[in-house]
């Protein structure tokens, strides 16, 4: 076991900095004034050093316990924010009583509240019987319903679903989505089952969750995750609505990520990848951060590598490519490909759909080494947890690590990246696009109307009336003999003049959510002199928000 010392949290080595105001801002990010050298210690170290939340951090080896990993990151954030939480309490208590209250609530937040472990039989198409194992973890009910995906994988375990559920709690808090965290897993390899068998498994798993009170529009709302998608979510919604929810008008809000015909929402499939893009965008366009990394702001001419070509990896690659970045390598479980001149995401997607693999793609070469160690500007781990470890972290050459996956970086690797001035954009912020748009879908299901349906024509007519009013006013003032002065909208305005579609509203709301949350993280990082430690800043924000709910609701019956 090891302890993160406060000094490591509150200081950071300075990298190359640009001249002018950007350099001064960078110095502030690194916890010192303009023109001052990096200090050996920072104000507040004496207080932070005696805090004890970081005692239970993950093991030192390369394969730490996943749930302990998340708890360790939580402890880092808690050790930073404890004094502020005590100071902000508005109760008639002594300093010691306030501190005890704060520590008590933090202990309430940290553990996983409920874990359901179940098994059930299915009859396979060949007549044989098989027992299927599954889990659903609910980390926190400070907000309900709980929210989190369902994954199908042979690697599913109790530890994994607990860790992912806890990440969901903090993720929702970071982006101000009013859900508690949850996660489910079914221990199968879906490639080994027919569609009929997968439908049996999905529907039976739904019934088992329903019998135990682990699914429902106001209780617990699953979503797609690894190896699940619209098809499985549709089966879940239909099963719930046809059985336990048959009297519930909101039954289809029991799950998100559904097809449009089943109450889904436009923009949900690409939401996580689009959120990854917006998350990177908010930091790569910030000159103060880029000066620390020795990079110029913007995506243009930046190179990136994607590990994992699933839903998240594909859509992240699409959006970065669209805005001028160049993908030079893509890795999957069966191999990796590389082309220093760039890989087109549409061509690669079409090839994989046709051949079932990335290998053999004619416009790239097979890559035998570790894709995580390729020299690039941005590395996007979008596969599974614990990919960046103490062993390979020193060899990572990317300047920005954008965590599209959940938990891809171990605590030891995270520490190494901080020491090397590598900017890690953390998972609990960066891949929150999926749950954000799931929230929009859930609201759509409860409201029983699609976004824009009630205002679409009104907005269109209002826009045209506005343009006609301007045109007529100009003609009366400046027109000769009643001549026309046509008002010609710009291309951008012309695209939106007819009114916002559901997809437009979803994309705009997602971009705003990611921008607002990024600003909150930047502000917290500067406030606590965290340097490039955005992960701790994000956890601090999440802890403050969850703490506020518990504190103001009262904890007598918690």
UniProtKB/Swiss-Prot annotation:
This is Glutamate dehydrogenase 2, mitochondrial. CDD domains: NAD_bind_1_Glu_DH (cd01076). It holds the Pfam family ELFV_dehydrog_N. Residues 1-53 form a transit peptide. It comes from the Eukaryota. Homohexamer. Substrate binds at residue 84. The active site is at residue 183. It catalyses: L-glutamate + NAD(+) + H2O = 2-oxoglutarate + NH4(+) + NADH + H(+); L-glutamate + NADP(+) + H2O = 2-oxoglutarate + NH4(+) + NADPH + H(+). One of its GO terms (biological process) is glutamate catabolic process. One of its GO terms (cellular component) is mitochondrion. InterPro entries: Aminoacid_DH-like_N_sf, Glu/Leu/Phe/Val/Trp_DH, Glu/Leu/Phe/Val/Trp_DH_C, Glu/Leu/Phe/Val/Trp_DH_dimer, Glu/Leu/Phe/Val_DH_AS, NAD(P)-bd_dom_sf, NAD_bind_Glu_DH.
């Amino acid at each position: 076991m090891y302890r993160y010392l406060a000094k490591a949290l509150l200081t950071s080595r300075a990298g190359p900095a640009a001249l002018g105001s950007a350099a001064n801002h960078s110095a502030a990010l690194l916890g010192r004034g303009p023109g001052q050298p990096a200090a050996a210690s920072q104000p507040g170290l004496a207080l932070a050093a005696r805090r004890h939340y970081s005692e239970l951090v993950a093991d030192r080896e390369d394969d730490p316990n996943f749930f302990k990993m998340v708890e360790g990151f939580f402890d880092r954030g808690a050790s930073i924010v404890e004094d502020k939480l005590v100071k902000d309490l508005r109760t008639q208590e002594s300093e010691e009583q306030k501190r005890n209250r704060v520590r008590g609530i933090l202990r309430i937040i940290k553990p996983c509240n409920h874990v359901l472990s179940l098994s059930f039989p299915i009859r396979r198409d060949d007549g044989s019987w098989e027992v299927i194992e599954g889990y659903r973890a609910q980390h926190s009910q400070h907000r309900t319903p709980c929210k989190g995906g369902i994954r199908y994988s042979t690697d599913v375990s109790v530890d994994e679903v607990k860790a992912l559920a806890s990440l969901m709690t903090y993720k929702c808090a970071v982006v101000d989505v009013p859900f508690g965290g949850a996660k489910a897993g079914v221990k199968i390899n879906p490639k080994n089952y027919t569609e009929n068998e997968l439908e049996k498994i999905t529907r039976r798993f739904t019934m088992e969750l329903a019998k135990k009170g682990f699914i429902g529009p106001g209780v617990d709302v699953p979503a797609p995750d690894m190896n699940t998608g619209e098809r499985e979510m549709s089966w879940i919604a239909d099963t719930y609505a046809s059985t336990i929810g048959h009297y519930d008008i909101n039954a289809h809000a029991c799950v998100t990520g559904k097809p449009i015909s089943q109450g889904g929402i436009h923009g949900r499939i690409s939401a996580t990848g689009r959120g990854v893009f917006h998350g990177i965008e908010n930091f790569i366009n910030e000159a103060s951060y880029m000066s620390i990394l020795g990079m110029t702001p913007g995506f243009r001419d930046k190179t990136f590598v994607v590990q994992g070509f699933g839903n998240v990896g594909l859509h992240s690659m699409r959006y970065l490519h669209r805005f001028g970045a160049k993908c030079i390598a893509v890795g999957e479980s069966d191999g990796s490909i590389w082309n220093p001149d760039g890989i087109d995401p549409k061509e690669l997607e079409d090839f994989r759909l046709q051949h079932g693999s990335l290998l053999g793609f004619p416009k790239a070469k097979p890559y035998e080494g570790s894709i995580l160690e390729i020299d690039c500007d941005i590395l996007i781990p979008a596969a599974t947890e614990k990919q960046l470890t103490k062993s390979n972290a020193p060899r990572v050459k990317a300047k920005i690590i954008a965590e599209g996956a959940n938990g891809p970086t171990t605590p030891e690797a995270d520490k190494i990246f901080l020491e090397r001035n590598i900017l890690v954009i953390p998972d609990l912020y960066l891949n929150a696009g999926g749950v954000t748009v799931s929230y929009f879908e859930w609201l759509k299901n409860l409201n029983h109307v699609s976004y824009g349906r009630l205002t679409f024509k009104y907005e269109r007519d209002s826009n045209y009336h506005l343009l006609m009013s301007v045109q007529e006013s100009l003609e009366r003032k400046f027109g000769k003999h009643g001549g026309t002065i046509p008002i010609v909208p710009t291309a951008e305005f012309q695209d939106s003049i007819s009114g916002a579609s559901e997809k437009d509203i979803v994309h705009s709301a997602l971009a705003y959510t990611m921008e607002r949350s990024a600003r909150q993280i930047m502000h917290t990082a500067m406030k606590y002199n965290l340097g490039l430690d955005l992960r701790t800043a994000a956890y601090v924000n999440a802890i403050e928000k969850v703490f506020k709910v518990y504190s103001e609701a009262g904890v007598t019956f918690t």
